Amino acid sequence: MTTIQQQRSSLLKGWPQFCEWVTSTNNRIYVGWFGVLMIPCLLAATTCFIVAFIAAPPVDIDGIREPVAGSFMYGNNIISGAVVPSSNAIGLHFYPIWEAATLDEWLYNGGPYQLVIFHFLIGISAYMGRQWELSYRLGMRPWICVAYSAPVSAAFAVFLVYPFGQGSFSDGMPLGISGTFNFMFVFQAEHNILMHPFHMAGVAGMFGGALFSAMHGSLVTSSLIRETTGLDSQNYGYKFGQEEETYNIVAAHGYFGRLIFQYASFNNSRSLHFFLASWPVICVWLTSMGICTMAFNLNGFNFNQSVVDTSGKVVPTWGDVLNRANLGMEVMHERNAHNFPLDLAAAESTSVALVAPAIG
């Protein structure tokens, strides 16, 4: 009994030091308890992604025995390469290595995709928790991790919620450049995302956030308080940790208020920076919500043949042009799976030409 207690005490001897090291804010890079989970998960996801991108064999993504190659060793380059999503034959089943009869079978059915995305999602969630943990240790407010939740929600939407809604991980976003574009085209074809208000909010958030960031940076740079001569860079006029303002917010406020109008300019630095953070974050949240609703086929607005003249004849609009483009993309994707688009099969045929050409 004494021997067992001595062994246990020797095993736990370094535990307090380990806890202190994990939670110490004096480390060059903060680890934290969330970091204990984050580091192995992101390492596993990154390692599997790199190996699969270089050497993974083709994957039967559609479940029809027609494998799609995505790795360098099978003829792809950095643009066309991808980690191909797991097979439609697997569906939503959890598919770790031990569920396959052989490693070749696991690779053929796209097992690396699930390994990467599951470890990646756990890793970025732990990274978000680590941001909160470090803020808590330093006595800061928790808004950094709240802002980071926007891209995290987007990742969960395309890698987890959308496959759940569509019934198969084969519908998830491929892990590559061309695969991402293919995912976007197919998403537009099947869900008309461009006509969804939440996607429009996301576009406003991205372009608006870039505009506001450029406006703020240029205003601050243009109203710096000169502390140097003309021979030195103005950057030398700032000392890290100085208490004085480094730019004149009154001058920036006055300039922008006269450029647009008075109330278009913030006179409070704190509310200004809250707006700069909240605008893109809220809009990306909305976009993620839109992806999650479209995952269950609550799609964007449909304005097909919505304008008619007094005789009931359809007056074509850009909505009809968009619909025709959607149909074209839909019939082209998964062209060997022989899944005829339901909206083409169910609706009346749309004439391409108004008058049949004369023969002879």
Swiss-Prot record:
Membrane topology listed for this record: Multi-pass membrane protein
Quaternary context: PSII is composed of 1 copy each of membrane proteins PsbA, PsbB, PsbC, PsbD, PsbE, PsbF, PsbH, PsbI, PsbJ, PsbK, PsbL, PsbM, PsbT, PsbX, PsbY, Psb30/Ycf12, peripheral proteins PsbO, CyanoQ (PsbQ), PsbU, PsbV and a large number of cofactors. It forms dimeric complexes.
Sites marked Stabilizes free radical intermediate: H191
Organism in which the protein naturally occurs: Prochlorococcus marinus (strain NATL2A)
Function: Photosystem II (PSII) is a light-driven water:plastoquinone oxidoreductase that uses light energy to abstract electrons from H(2)O, generating O(2) and a proton gradient subsequently used for ATP formation. It consists of a core antenna complex that captures photons, and an electron transfer chain that converts photonic excitation into a charge separation. The D1/D2 (PsbA/PsbD) reaction center heterodimer binds P680, the primary electron donor of PSII as well as several subsequent electron acceptors.
Gene Ontology BP, a term: photosynthetic electron transport in photosystem II
Binding-site positions, a quinone: H216, S265, F266
Entry EC number(s): 1.10.3.9
Extra facts: Cyanobacteria usually contain more than 2 copies of the psbA gene. 2 of the reaction center chlorophylls (ChlD1 and ChlD2) are entirely coordinated by water.
Annotated positions binding Fe cation: H216, H273
Annotated positions binding [CaMn4O5] cluster: D171, E190, H333, E334, D343, A345
Membrane recorded as keyword: yes
Post-translational modification as stated in the protein's UniProt record: Tyr-162 forms a radical intermediate that is referred to as redox-active TyrZ, YZ or Y-Z. C-terminally processed by CtpA; processing is essential to allow assembly of the oxygen-evolving complex and thus photosynthetic growth.
UniProt-listed HAMAP family: PSII_PsbA_D1
Catalysed reactions, as listed in the record: 2 a plastoquinone + 4 hnu + 2 H2O = 2 a plastoquinol + O2
Disulfide bond residue pairs: none
Annotated positions binding chlorophyll a ChlzD1: H119
UniProt binding sites for chlorophyll a PD1: H199
Record's protein name: Photosystem II protein D1
